[in-house]
Amino acid sequence: MAFVSGFTGMPVTARVSKAVCRTRMALEGGKSSGGGEATRDPEPTAVDPNDPKGKQQAIHVAPSFADYLKAQADKKKAEGK
């Protein structure tokens, strides 16, 4: 590995599967590899119904790509291009 690492100029690191990471966290009582608690919270998050930002959605409905291309083509035809 040292030869390959020196040849490419980048360090060669071993890949660890997600299953190994999950098993390690389970064996360590929910602690992550950095020593902190696991980030998965099984309890639902409380949402304030009066918060206007709480009603916003991150992903908005958008037309399909085919519909978008058709709209762009129609727009160009209308402009005479």
Swiss-Prot record:
UniProt keywords, alphabetically: Chloroplast, Plastid, Transit peptide
Region (Disordered): 27-57
Transit peptide: 1-25
Cellular component aspect of the GO annotation: chloroplast
Top-rank taxon: Eukaryota
Location relative to the cell: Plastid, Chloroplast
Protein name according to UniProt: Protein PYP1
Originating organism: Pyropia yezoensis (Susabi-nori)
